[in-house]
Amino acid sequence: MGSTLRTVSDRTFTHGKGLLLVGLLWATIPGSLHAQMDPYFTAINYPVEKQSFMVMALSDLQVARYGNDFATGMFMVQYGVTPQWTVGVMAEGQKISGMPATYGGIRLNTYIHLFRDDRLLNLTLYGEYEDLNGAALYKMEVAGFGPEDLTEPLSLARETSVRTFEQRVIVYHDWGRLNATFNFIRETALQAPHGSDYGYALGFFFKPSWTGESMAGMADMAAPPALSMSRLGYGLEMIGALGDNERFGFYWNSQQHYVGPVFTYDFSSRWSVRLEPAVGLSDVSDPFVLRMGVAYMFGTHH
């Protein structure tokens, strides 16, 4: 049985390599590339503008499938080293109902946009080192099988080290104001038994008409009033798991999957807020997650 599973897995990954090659070939069509603010919570697309910082405070309120409801928080700082290369650091914590607030750990990430200009498929490679503990619950991604609610004692979870290396292949494209983004996610354990879990993030987003028009070459246009629909962006984000090395693919009710509308509001070119009410789609997903965030960008061009 084990050899059969490995054969199926090998065929799946061979097919996946073929799809990646097709994506690389499609990505050879050039255009113009602009740095913008990433609107999603889990899906990643745009690099941070060169010599600019993006600071984000993110919080999730989650109705737990198992155990007590909880709130999680993530503080993130990212820096654009070059127009194509971004580095960042993230720290997270959580508060489970009836338990004390707990530190979840730290993440270090970097991602490189492979081309200087815009392509049919803008291809980015992403890597993230995660030094977390067993109580870390923020949904930066979901992967593998089963739920992620805390079912063991908090004191034990806090002492359990969870170190992983996350990799993503990111593709996105803009058609005017519309952005489409897809992330293929792999999480590799840096501790025994060193297996890998897989997941995905998919998003479609209409950028605010004010910023969309500015990016299209109308940067001198007057800013809209503080309360204006032209400052509102909206879209849809879906995230989920794709199994592991032994069973890769959709096993729907054994994996977490979430979908929800995402909204952003740009108070200025520096400040933005975002909101996503997401619902769980499977038997092991949390029923509801309210995702919130505030972002601030500053640097040489802000």
Where are these regions (language model features)?
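Transmembrane beta-barrel domains of Gram-negative outer membranes and organellar outer membranes
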Residues: A35-H302
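N-terminal secretory signal peptides that target proteins for export/translocation
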Residues: M1-H15
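A ubiquitous, low-specificity "background" feature that marks scattered single residues
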Residues: F13, L21-G23, I44, G243
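Bacterial N-terminal signal peptides
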Residues: K17-P30
